[in-house]
From Swiss-Prot:
Record's keyword terms, sorted: Cytoplasm, DNA-binding
Cellular localisation: Cytoplasm, Nucleoid
The organism's taxonomic lineage, starting at the top: Bacteria, Pseudomonadati, Pseudomonadota, Alphaproteobacteria, Hyphomicrobiales
Assembly and binders: Homodimer.
HAMAP family, per database record: DNA_YbaB_EbfC (MF_00274)
Protein known as: Nucleoid-associated protein Nwi_0368
Organism: Nitrobacter winogradskyi (strain ATCC 25391 / DSM 10237 / CIP 104748 / NCIMB 11846 / Nb-255)
Function: Binds to DNA and alters its conformation. May be involved in regulation of gene expression, nucleoid organization and DNA protection.
One GO cellular component term: bacterial nucleoid
Length: 106
């Protein structure tokens, strides 16, 4: 019975830490870039796009496809960085729990 109570307490602590981590992920912002920084995307670690910046030199009707490709690339770069930030936070949270691999927490 004591083991069960200990597990319940540990689960409650984990839930509290997860909530705190989710709040932290809202505050972490990363920048993705493409075209040598001509297009940048700012995103939270929870994958919420906060802004896109496009250098005025790229805003030409005849170069629309290039601009579209650069935006997609910058978004992908920001997403990759946001995923890394999220994984680092999750690893810090779950590192001492001894969870088996493959649960999506590490």
């Amino acid at each position: 019975m004591a083991d069960f109570l200990g597990m319940m307490k540990q689960a409650a602590q984990f839930q509290s830490k997860m909530k705190a981590m989710q709040d932290e992920l809202d505050q972490i912002e990363v920048d993705g870039a493409s075209g040598g920084g001509l297009v940048t995307v700012r995103m939270t670690a929870k994958m919420e796009v906060k802004g896109i910046s496009i250098d005025p030199s790229l805003i030409k009707p005849d170069e629309r496809e290039i601009l579209e490709d650069l935006v997609v690339t910058a978004l992908a770069d920001a997403r990759r960085k946001a995923e890394v930030a999220m994984q680092e936070k999750m690893q810090a949270l779950t590192g001492g729990l001894g969870l088996p691999p493959g649960l999506g927490f590490s």
